[in-house]
Amino acid sequence: MLYTDDVLNGIIDTAASSESFRDQCQAEIDALYTDNEQSVLWQCMENKPDLIQEDLSRIIRNNLNTSPPAALFRGISKKTMEYLEDLRYVGAIIEFNRVMSFSRDWQVARNFASYSFYGTRNIFCINNAPYAYNYQEAIFKMICGAPPEEFNGAYPEATRKSNLHLVNDEDEFMFPAGTTLRVDLIETHPLNNLYTVWHLTVLN
């Protein structure tokens, strides 16, 4: 979680009522990203289609944060579990050809890995990553800076509010395509034996 509920609600109210606040947020985004790059980042609110993978990976590499959280988590999908079938050992090297999203919040990863979503009950944990892209920070500011007409529906500020809550809760960080990882440990979670945790180190 980026902000507490009280702070988040204050930001939401300011974004809805203050054009100067929105302009300031947008100016900060414009200083970092082109219009095309902003369009790519907006699309990631829903998913990360093949069409934007190359551009998204480039954006990530150009805007890496070298002080990410000490631990980042990701619920493992069924498709990824198939890929990992022959990599269930310490020292195995994992490389993905797509952008990968992680969260600083264990609960977010657990929810994705649970039976209500992926159903694998397996979770990646990257420890002490040398870098990551703070997508949450970027898209949060973009949503704050967007004019009301950017949001669909009869109640644009309600859409802004729900989007900001979603982004705030997911705590999303990204790694570019081609990131190489090493398996350091595969263990049952010590506080929840229903889940298996893959501890990983970023190699490149």
Name these PLM-found stretches:
Residues 1-204:
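Mono-ADP-ribosyltransferase
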